[in-house]
Structures are given as structure tokens and as C-alpha cells.
Amino acid sequence: MKKSIFTSLYLQVLVAITIGILLGHFYPDLGTQMKPLGDGFVKLIKMIIAPVIFCTVVTGIAGMESMKAVGRTGAIALLYFEVVSTIALIIGLVVVNILQPGVGMNVDPNALDTKAVAVYADQAAQQGIVAFLLDVIPSSVIGAFASGNILQVLLFAVMFGFALHHLGEKGQLIFNVIDSFAKVIFGVINMIMKLAPIGAFGAMAFTIGKYGVGTLVQLGQLILCFYITCALFVVLVLGSIAKATGFSIFRFIAYIKEELLIVLGTSSSESALPRMLDKMEKVGCQKSVVGLVIPTGYSFNLDGTSIYLTMAAVFIAQATNAQMDIWHQVTLLVVLLLSSKGAAGVTGSGFIVLAATLSAVGHLPVAGLALILGIDRFMSEARALTNLIGNGVATIVVAKRCRQLNEKQMNAVLGGRDSALRDPIA
């Protein structure tokens, strides 16, 4: 029996977002009161992220024939992340220099109210490469799961998977238990996703109700430049990578349209992580590749965040008339190559990394963060959407490079033009 269009999660979330925008615009006070709906949905998603990553990574690694393949997958993924995120940083830098959205604003940094950004500056002071690397190691396994730290859970899951693999037949019972537990967890995910329209409605109503459409108009040029840049990056850069890998970026976007709408409503790519793990397996990527690439990409492959960081930093310099010659911009790029890896796929993380970057560069006024604080919530949506698409493309690319991609299945799912591609897994 053909399913009704009204049962489509895609349509339900789209309608919910539209209603949320209207409510927030016409009844802003009521709209801001809808915040708990969005927060509640995101908390439900975060509740199951740690067990999903653990189960996916452990069963993926333990089920592989060779441990060398795991190391090769990780190395290829990290190399891909570094190259593509660097391209994203450079594109953001080039576009903001060409369009110059901040030129002519002539803002005095000393006149800005920095109270609102003080909390971000304080968090940014805690950022650092050594601190970031040490934070990957959990103080306790229970603590890693309790805090929902993706990289900490991933580290433990990889070690657990290796140990389980070395047990061989003795570990089969544990493997079966974890595999069965994973099926239960994905059942829980399906239950939670039925609440996605409510969560998207609440988050969008709050955003529009609190910040208003007027905020968009006030600094609309920067927002427009950023959205255009993200769109160009997805179509041109990720599109070219997708084409070289054997699939269409537009078909892939259509394939993950429900996840994209959930991200649009919540402004966090993390909210779609559990479903992305499942969908990337269904598109033909081996579980071991999906389990490594997707969670790692949430800290090392945030293309949208990379574009945002360079554009926002230079915009602040332009708006406050801070000097930014070619060497200052090269310094900014080098700093961002490191600091951008500390961002996670959660709302607000990009703003914290931006604060850390301004502090590290030195000659850019941290007070300038106050300029974009009001519109950061709107820009975070484009960041999250680009991050999600980028991590999905990365998974397919790495899977193909590691010969862990069922290309026949990929073409069947995405409707690719070449249905006669070989199946390297079979």
C-alpha cells in the first residue's frame, strides 16, 4: 500500500518549521516559550548518540577481517578531512575579501557591549591543541558516555573493537549481544524521530521569536554572503568530489532530505547523527567505515564551520577597520587550520572557536564578536547543513577509496547513471 504524503517525515518537519517561523514572527513572546520543545528533542537525540556510536564502531571493527584496514581507513579519512576543510577555509577567505560585507560599517570596538560575548570568550580561553588532545582521553568510560563526548566514546569504542576482534571466537557472544543492542537502539531512534516535527517547530519558533526577522535585515549582507558561499561549496567542491566518486550530489542531498530538515530546524548537525549512521550503511558503505568516518568528521570535517570562521573573522576586521593585510590573513588561515578542529557539531561551538581564533591572532578585536552574536543563530543553520552534507560525502569517498563501498547498492539507492559498476565487497 502506498504511504500517504502526510506520513512523510520530510513534509511534517517542513510544515512544522513553517508554522514555527509564522508563530515566532507574529507572536514572538509565545514563540520564545516554545524553546523547551526544541531543547527536549535535541536532548533525546543526544541521549542515544553515545550508545549508537559505540555499537556501530565496535561491531564494524570487530567484524573486519584485517585490522590493517581499520588503520588505513582512519588515515585516509583524516587526510581527506584536512584537505577538504582547508579548501573550505580558503574559499571563505576568498569570498569575504571579494564581497567585503563589513566594509563601510566603521564600528568602534570600544563602543560595543561585550557582556553578551563574555561567556564565549571565557570558553575560548580554555581552547588549545594540547587541551583538545587530552580531552579526547576520558577520565572514565562511564564519564565519556555520561557527558556524551563523541571523540571520547569513539576512542573507547575503537579500542574495545580491536580487543574484541583479537578474542576471535571467544568474543562472538559479546559481539552478538552488542549487535542486538544496536538494533534496539535504532528502534529507539525511530521512536524519537517521530517527535522531530515538534522539535523543529519549537526551535524555529524560539529563534524567530527571540531574534526576529529584523536581525536578519540588519546584517543581511553577511548572512547572504555566507549562505551563497556554502551553497557554492556544496555544489562546486562537494559536487565535483561526488561526481569523481560516481554519484550525484543532488541525488545524495535528496536522499538525506529528512535529515537536512531536522538539522535546519535544530541548527545542529549532531541531531541527525544517528540517522546518518544508518543511512550511510544503506547507501552501500561498510559499517566499519561509517562508524569511523561519521563520528570523527563531527570534529575534523566541519566544512560549513570552516567557511564561517574565515568569513566571520575577516568581516569583524572589515567592520572595525582592523588591519588585515595578506600576511595577517595567512596567519589567520594557519591558526584556523588548527583551531577549527576543536569544533563539534553542536549549536554554538563555531562561535566559541571563533572567539578562540580572534584571541590567538591577536590584532583582531574580540569585542567584535558582539557584531555577529545576534545573527550567529541564523548562520548556524547553513553551517550545520553544509557540515552534514560534507560528512556524508566524505563517508562515501573514504569507503570507495578503501574498497568498502558496494557501488551497485549505491547506484540503486541514489539512482546513479552507471548501474553496471563492479561490487568490490561481494
From Swiss-Prot:
Q: Would the keyword rRNA-binding be found if you checked this record's keyword annotation? A: no
Among the GO molecular function terms of this UniProt record, one is: malate:proton symporter activity
Q: What is the superkingdom listed in this entry's lineage?
A: Bacteria
GO terms classed as biological process: L-aspartate transmembrane transport
- Give the bilayer topology: Multi-pass membrane protein
InterPro entries, per database record: C4_dicarb_transport, Na-dicarboxylate_symporter, Na-dicarboxylate_symporter_CS, Na:dicarbo_symporter_sf
Q: Where in the cell is it found?
A: Cell inner membrane
Q: Among the entry's GO cellular component annotations, what is one?
A: plasma membrane
Q: Which UniProt keywords apply?
A: Cell inner membrane, Cell membrane, Membrane, Symport, Transmembrane, Transmembrane helix, Transport
- Hey, which family's this protein in? Belongs to the dicarboxylate/amino acid:cation symporter (DAACS) (TC 2.A.23) family.
Under HAMAP family, the record lists: C4_dicarb_transport (MF_01300)
State its role.
Answer: Responsible for the transport of dicarboxylates such as succinate, fumarate, and malate from the periplasm across the membrane.
**What name goes with this protein?**
C4-dicarboxylate transport protein
Lineage runs: Bacteria, Pseudomonadati, Pseudomonadota, Gammaproteobacteria, Enterobacterales
Per UniProt, what is the name of the gene that codes for the protein in this document? dctA
